A protein has these predicted regions:
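Beta-strand-rich recognition/accessory modules
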Residues: 216, 220-223, 228-231, 235-242, ...
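Hot-dog-fold acyl-thioester-processing enzymes
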Residues: 1-83, 149-153, 158-228
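A residue-level detector for conformationally permissive "hinge/kink" positions
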Residues: 21-25, 194, 202, 234, ...
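HotDog/MaoC-like acyl-thioester-processing domains
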Residues: 1-14, 81-170, 240, 244-247, ...
Length: 291
């Protein structure tokens, strides 16, 4: 069934509730690479509830997961994550219940031989006070599903990366089984676990979830710039440019200008850039120098 543009852009979902526990918060942190050294107290605060448990800001991408685009006409097995944007209105609680509303913002037709670029937005608030918590915008690229008559103009311009050597770099090696761990957050797409399916759609092995790479980039910023202070991040935006294979090493290059941290991620083993045009927005009180 081809994509129906008018149906697609009319999609809305309101009042979607999501309850999560401190177990979910710790699982997310572990699944993006936090806590590799269990003796390092800085990361232990994200995976051990002895102190007030810290929350990784990009966990919002998991909490915002709503099946808004289910049965929209594209081939689910060929979908790639293109972009992810996040605005944190206040730090995520370690547990709680959320109410989320989601909508399709736009769908760009990149041509029948290319695909469709679809943007959705999700806003979440807490049930305790009904105050905004975060807003996420997600862009997916449905390969081979173009030619449906959607918008043909340019998609939003990316964040520019400074034209100078990076101020700092952070190296994080992913685990061979990291996709198996990350999928427990709720993304059961078989592309990340089924070797036969991965080969059928053009990958040598199952790929790491784009949002896992996204979380790993956030870990790099927390570690290198924020001194592990999760409350210092108020925005986190990326463009995905290539997949990561589990077990590869992600190097995050960072540039800091005031409260804006620009970053890009590359795979050490293949010398491939996997995240471009990254932008992390910090609170005004978090303008320290990269470590």
């Amino acid at each position: 069934m081809p994509i129906d543009y008018q149906h697609l852009i009319s999609l809305r979902s309101t009042g979607h509730t999501r309850r999560y526990s401190d177990r979910d918060t710790m699982l997310y942190a572990l699944s993006i690479g936090m806590g590799r050294d269990p003796l390092a107290g800085t990361e232990l605060d994200y995976v051990f509830e002895r102190n007030p448990l810290k929350t990784v800001p990009t966990m919002a991408s998991v909490l915002a997961r709503i099946p808004l685009l289910k049965d929209c006409g594209y081939d689910y097995t060929k979908v790639l994550h293109a972009e992810q944007h996040l605005v944190i209105h206040r730090p995520l609680p370690q547990d709680g219940e959320l109410i989320a509303d989601a909508r399709v913002i736009e769908a760009y037709d990149k041509g029948a031989d290319k695909g469709a670029l679809i943007y959705t937005e999700t806003t979440a608030r807490t049930t305790t006070d009904d105050e905004p918590l975060f807003t996420t915008t997600s862009g997916i690229f449905a390969r081979g599903d173009g030619g449906f008559g959607g918008a043909t103009g340019p998609s939003p311009a990316p964040h520019p990366i400074p034209n100078r050597p990076p101020d700092a770099s952070c190296q994080i090696r992913t685990r061979e089984d990291q996709a198996l761990l990350y999928r427990l957050n709720g993304d059961r797409n078989p592309l990340h676990v089924d070797p036969e399916l991965a080969t059928r759609v053009g990958f040598p092995v199952p790929i790491l979830h784009g949002l896992c790479t996204y979380g790993t980039a956030c870990l790099a910023v927390l570690k290198t710039v924020c001194h592990y202070d999760h409350t210092s991040i108020t925005g986190f935006d990326v463009r995905f440019s290539a997949p990561v294979y589990p077990g590869e090493t992600i190097i995050t290059d960072l540039w800091q200008d005031g409260n804006i941290v620009s970053f890009e991620c590359r795979v050490k083993e293949r010398k491939v850039t996997v995240i471009r045009n990254g932008k992390c927005t910090l609170t005004d009180s978090s303008r320290g120098e990269p470590q």
